[in-house]
From Swiss-Prot:
Organism: Bos taurus
Main subcellular location: nucleus
Superkingdom of source: Eukaryota
Residue positions, PTM N-acetylalanine: 2
InterPro entries referenced in this protein's UniProt entry, alphabetically: PNMA, PNMA_C, PNMA_N
Location of the region described as Disordered in the Swiss-Prot/TrEMBL record: 335-364
Keyword terms, alphabetized: Acetylation, Nucleus
Protein name as catalogued: Paraneoplastic antigen Ma2 homolog
GO cellular component: nucleolus
Biased composition (Acidic residues): 335-351
Homology family: Belongs to the PNMA family.
Subcellular location: Nucleus, Nucleolus
Length: 364
């Protein structure tokens, strides 16, 4: 266990494990200067510290470093994670009077919920239980509070649960679990809007889904502009990994897309919509006339029945072209009508005058 490693390491070096931190997950190629640069910024609220040593952890394929805090630490301001080279570095520390195994399990549970122990106390609003007082709280009291969280999760905790993004690497040969870039981008664009946290946290969550060249690009754009927004990061991904067809190409591709032989009109409209949205994104077609352009292209590029053509012509003459869903509703209704009419004709009995046995009885 990580905390046990911290205790053993401190015991070997004869330092106080209550005034020490262990940072894990540091890439092997990260120099000491790079490590110091990250730690100095993140651990500034803790005052002076001393770097005691570094070890390689084979199971993580990463390094860990041990720090000695030279001033009495304020546990409530110690971060559990820091953003470093190659991704997230975990910070391991020991609090006074804590039960090692219990608190490790508690932290693991809260980590899955997107929470911390101090954040849990703030959310529950316990009288007299501030984050600064947390080191002196007994495991029994922590267990009681955890039971409250499980039985009655407070509202401030719930929004912190967030939908995670699928993995994306941008590699030439993607992993089996990866989505195509366009699918991943569409998902990411929608999900990041739901994350109820600050931009810095959104960028950290976004980075958790990135691997390989995609992660490298994220580091580059953040280095160029530390205040860059998540939306701007996704725009950078679109420029590097997306389809780079020109405005003119996307416009021509849309206008020259026609209904194929044997293809239903509704299927054609659905296929056309993907191209239209791409053209709008490229600003090849103004967004405010997209409904009008869609209707005109369907009337020009599809083989329509006389009834459907008249209905669409009527919609066009009204001056308020239908939205995509409204247009699909009209087309699907007409397709259902045509299918019903064809079925009725198919089911009519064979015979000369079409009256069936009723007509035969009348002639008797």
């Amino acid at each position: 266990m990580a905390l046990a490693l911290l205790e053993d390491w401190c015991r070997i070096l004869s330092v106080d494990d209550q005034k020490s931190l262990m940072v894990m997950g540091i890439p092997v190629d990260c120099s000491e200067d790079e490590i110091q640069e990250v730690l100095q910024e993140i651990l500034k609220p803790l005052g002076r510290y001393k770097l005691l040593g570094k070890i390689f952890r084979k199971q993580e394929n990463a390094n860990a470093v041990l720090l000695e805090l030279l001033e009495d630490p304020e546990v409530s301001v110690i971060p559990s994670k820091v953003q470093g080279k190659g991704g997230i570095w975990k910070v391991i520390f020991k609090t006074p009077n804590q039960d090692t195994e219990f608190l490790e399990r508690l932290n693991l549970f809260l980590e899955k919920e997107g929470q911390t122990v101090s954040g849990m106390f703030r959310a529950l609003g316990h009288q007299g239980l501030s984050p600064a007082a947390m080191p002196c709280i007994s495991p029994e009291l922590l267990a009681h509070v955890l039971g409250q969280v499980i039985a009655h999760p407070p509202q401030p905790l719930l929004p912190m649960r967030y939908r995670k993004l699928r993995v994306f690497s941008g590699s030439a040969v993607p992993a089996p679990e990866e989505e195509p870039f366009e699918v991943w981008l569409e998902q990411a664009t929608e999900i990041v809007k739901e994350w109820p946290v600050a931009e810095a946290e959104k960028k950290r969550w976004l980075m958790e889904s990135l691997r390989g060249p995609a992660l490298d690009l994220m580091h580059i754009v953040q280095a160029d502009n530390p205040s860059i927004s998540v939306e701007e990061c996704l725009e950078a991904f679109k420029q590097v990994f997306g389809n780079l067809e020109s405005r003119r190409t996307s416009q021509v591709k849309y206008l020259k897309t026609y209904q194929e032989e044997g293809e239903k009109v509704s299927a054609y409209v659905l296929r056309l919509e993907t191209l239209l949205r791409r053209a709008v994104e490229k600003r090849a077609i103004p967004r405010n006339i997209a409904d009008q352009i869609r209707l005109e292209q369907v009337m020009a590029g599809a083989s329509l029945s006389e009834v459907l053509w008249c209905r669409l012509r009527e919609l066009k003459d009204q001056g308020r072209p239908p939205s995509f869903l409204q247009l699909m509703k009209v087309i699907r209704e007409e397709e259902e009508e045509e299918a019903t009419f064809e079925n009725e004709n198919t089911e009519e009995p064979e015979g000369g005058d079409g009256y069936g046995h009723w007509g035969n009885e009348a002639n008797d």
